[in-house]
Amino acid sequence: GDNHGIKIYDVDLEEGRLTEKAEVEITNSSYVTISHNGKFLYSITDFGVECFQIMPDGDLNFVNKASINGMRGCYLSTDYDDKFLFCAGYHDGKITVLRLNRETGAVGEITDEIYHRGLGSVAERSFRPHISCVKMTRDNKYLCAADLGIDYVNVYRLNQERGVLNQVDIIRCDLNSAPRHLKFSEDGKFLYIVGELKNCIDVYTYHEENGLPFFDLIQSIPTTNRYQMQGIAASALNISADGKYILASNAGENSVTLFEIDPEKGTLTRMFCLPISGEYPKDAALFPDNQHLVSLNHESDTMTFFKVDHDMKCIVMNQKEIKIKQANCIIFHLLQD
């Protein structure tokens, strides 16, 4: 979160706790992602992006860094073959595509740069493009780019050889909904988009027909107890390791909301929406066993921990909070043998 960079923790699944193991110094690491082969970690920095090899003991070994030729990014992801790295630009409304070395993980040259264009609805934050998330469809054909400034999710076909994007569709979200993050279901058939200002998750079906992507809205479900109330902003969106649950966090209300995913229909059923004993939950995630939950509270500089009672549909505070300065992002990673 702070200038000290990336903290590495050992995970105690039984107790639902984290123990600090190491710290990697890096300038303002605001978001990290792990390659789909599990070998490399990529981080946003003030300079651009940096790559680290994940060592057998979980430590990080610096590989290289690369410029994104623009203002600092806010979100990173890779395609499912780990051939390209995508960086979302909140401040300049730009998608940057960089080539990856699949053997070393090193970040290479920029293969494409696309600026979103358009106007939002109000003459404040939402009057120009702010790309907040970029994710590939699970069939590795299309890149979806959420833009909370103009209430669109732009869809691009990825040229797998050249790393070039070609726009083929637009998902038009509700006016002033501010699509912030998106996730695909484990089978790739459903898309979940959380609206920062709408405080709602929109569920879409996804399929390809005649070489084109199709997205159809099938559900909208609130993330908060007070639907569309001012002063509340949906922030994180994470799917559990087994794909059975989806978790959203809400700033302002300072709560987390857990939903169960219908494996056939893709629709969501809310289990609970409860406070996280901290301020501005920038990110939140279930432990890999789904029995515990952690919230990263950006404004109170804490991580808070909870036991998840699936029968009673509630969470219970689990021991003391951990102090951490301005935490932004958390990822659980199972070390490879």
Where are these regions (language model features)?
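Short loop/turn segments immediately following the C-termini of beta-strands
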Residues: 1, 46, 90, 100, ...
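Short loop/turn segments immediately following beta-strands, especially the blade-tip
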Residues: 9-15, 52-59, 97-108, 156-164, ...
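A short beta-strand motif characteristic of beta-propeller blades
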Residues: 19-25, 61-67, 118-124, 166-172, ...
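Blade-loop segments of beta-propeller domains
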Residues: 20-82
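Beta-rich, blade/repeat-based domains predominating
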Residues: 26-36, 69-80, 117-138, 173-188, ...
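Asp-box/WD-like beta-propeller blade repeats and closely related beta-sheet repeat scaffolds
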Residues: 61-133
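Blade-level signature of beta-propeller repeat domains, shared across WD40, Kelch, NHL, RCC1
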Residues: 298-304, 316-337
